[in-house]
Swiss-Prot record:
Assembly mode: Part of the 50S ribosomal subunit.
UniProt GO molecular function: rRNA binding; structural constituent of ribosome
GO biological process, one term: cytoplasmic translation
Protein name: Large ribosomal subunit protein uL6
Origin species: Aliarcobacter butzleri (strain RM4018) (Arcobacter butzleri)
Listed SUPFAM superfamilies: Ribosomal protein L6
Role: This protein binds to the 23S rRNA, and is important in its secondary structure. It is located near the subunit interface in the base of the L7/L12 stalk, and near the tRNA binding site of the peptidyltransferase center.
Amino acid sequence: MSRIGKKPITIPAGIEVTVNGTLISVKKGNNVSTVETHGRVGIEVANGQVILTRNGDTKESSAFWGTYRALTANAINGLHEGFTKSLEINGVGYRATLKGDILELALGYSHPINYEIPKGLEITVEKNIVSVKGADKQQVGQAAAIIRGFRKPEPYKGKGVKYTDEKIIRKAGKTSKK
């Protein structure tokens, strides 16, 4: 069992955390992030920390305890620092351009792929690197996964869209018979 729920979450300066029943609201300026928790978890804000407690000793309450602690920490960290995922585009003629709030990708198909950037996310393009930034960790990861899914990297030449820290396992091509 992980016991990650035991760790208190330190609230950074400039972040305001309020609890209303089972709803945790994290606020910084005009940005608000909310986490809907389960009744099996108790929430307390004191001394600049958020402390989550289990309501009961069941296996489910332990699972919810760690999950909601992680979700709350992600909401606080997202508004404080933000999350970033970087993608690398490899291939001849493969490129990405920004046109307003649309990311246009040329990935070897007969047509360009237009991806509408969701609200709350910021996408930047530098040469062959596409960076997805935002306050919601789930939304940043989902957008990066969708962009990667347009042309996953293939194992023979490594062409496609991959995460910058992703390792592509390369395969050897066919060998000729003599």
